[in-house]
Amino acid sequence: MRIIVLGSAAGGGHPQWNCHTLASLRAWQQTDGAQRRTQASIAVSADGERWVLINASPDFRQQILATPALWPQHGLRHSPIEAVLLTSGEIDHIAGLLSMRESQRFSLHASSRVLGLLAQNPIFDAVNPQYVSRQPFALDTPLVLCGLQLTPFSVPGKVPLFMESRSGGDLAGSDEETLGLTIDDGRRRMHYIPGCAAMTDALRARLQSAELVFFDGTLWRDDEMVQLGVSQKTGQRMGHMSIDGPDGTIAAFAPLNVARKIFIHLNTTNPVLDTLSPEFASARASGWEVAHDGLEIAL
């Protein structure tokens, strides 16, 4: 199995277009230890020729330009991307579909909930249904795409930002709002969980002794943005675990014996983005890696 991290940042990328916090400033200036990042997405392949795109980032075109494996290979129109799978209806997971509207055949897979959100907004009709079939999947039921077996499962999260005003106060929504994926090529297995609000017993059991896990790394601390003065929202309010602290991701994973753990979906305020920061050093000392755009892994 081959995995390419197309984008590693949370919504808005790093730096976000209007962010002038220290972490973002270093990315603007591209000082030592700082690297610009696009919004989170990965591509996965069993054979290096046919690829499944996991989430369609608003930075889709930039990510394709940076990834020769995903360039057109033959004919006048072609893409190695044969399927797209969405783990949520968040803007940074669906907006890239609008950059895939050039009548190229691929299959689009998502929960009924997320496909319903797309159907409610006619702008997504630009992704020609004569070429792009929208296929709902059931939770905890494997689907086979491009020689890979992908199993979607529910994790704690919340409704997309643009649906909060319509949620009636129930921000958690249905069990199809926020999903993780188990991806298996018949020999090796990985898990991809770019958003998660809490570690549950079911998730703990699923990840025990896993070979590779990409996991939500949005914030270093729950009140990070509040302390910086850029927002009143905590990580929990946004539907994300934080990396540090007694209830954080590092602590939650400590007893799970996961062989390789990688943070992805990193918010522009997160100090772990700076490879020279003490937070980055702390994460590495705890056995974690921090994803970056262009990271490639062969399992």
From Swiss-Prot:
Disulfide bonds: none annotated. Keywords: PQQ biosynthesis, Transport. The keyword Chloroplast does not apply. The gene is pqqB. GO terms for biological process: pyrroloquinoline quinone biosynthetic process. It comes from the Bacteria. Pathway: Cofactor biosynthesis; pyrroloquinoline quinone biosynthesis. This is Coenzyme PQQ synthesis protein B. The keyword Transport applies.
